[in-house]
Amino acid sequence: MNTVKVGSVIIGEDYIPIQTMLKNPVKDVETSLYKINNLQKIGCDIIRITVPDEESAFYLKEVVKQSPIPIVADIHFDYKLAIKAIEAGVHKVRINPGNIGSEERVKRVIDCLKEYQIPVRIGINGGSLPAHLKEKYNFDTIKIMVE
């Protein structure tokens, strides 16, 4: 069986880890840590946090440092934020290659993930697919996502 280690949590074995996502801005470190600690107490294993801008990436480091459970950085649009999140010590990154930008940008994120030995979740959705591919494949989103 294939497994993926996210911090101290192993995904892919008999136990199914519970993950949730914070709704508050990560720059509110005190609230973030309060919620993370409470979520851990009721059984949450992994927390996902949106990193929408540079300021969030800056505060993410402190949240990761103090969190009792692994942190996943959810990145949209800016590949540099993914790199900053990895450098901040997150335990996993979620990216959507459809909105990160060019193949070169995706490669830079992947290279950084490899360097830090951090797993990635590739999350693709129809909303981020390029219009020219939608037309080329007659809106067959599965074929488009594979390309």
For each predicted feature, which ranges?
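N-terminal amphipathic alpha-helix/helix-capping segment at the start of soluble metabolic enzymes
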Residues: 1-21, 26, 114
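Hydrophobic faces of well-ordered beta-strands that scaffold small-molecule active sites
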Residues: 16-22, 45-49, 71-75, 93-95, ...
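Glycine-rich, proline-tolerant flexible connector loops at the mouths of alpha/beta enzymes
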Residues: 23, 28, 40-66, 94-103
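Short, acidic/polar
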Residues: 26-38, 77-83, 145
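Glycine-enriched alpha-helix->loop->beta-strand junction motifs that scaffold or abut catalytic
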Residues: 43, 66-69, 86-93, 114-117
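Alpha-helix-loop-beta-strand connector modules within alpha/beta enzyme cores
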Residues: 54-75, 107-121
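Hydrophobic, well-structured modules enriched for small/aliphatic residues and gly/pro motifs
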Residues: 72-85, 92-109
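Conserved anion-binding
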Residues: 100-147
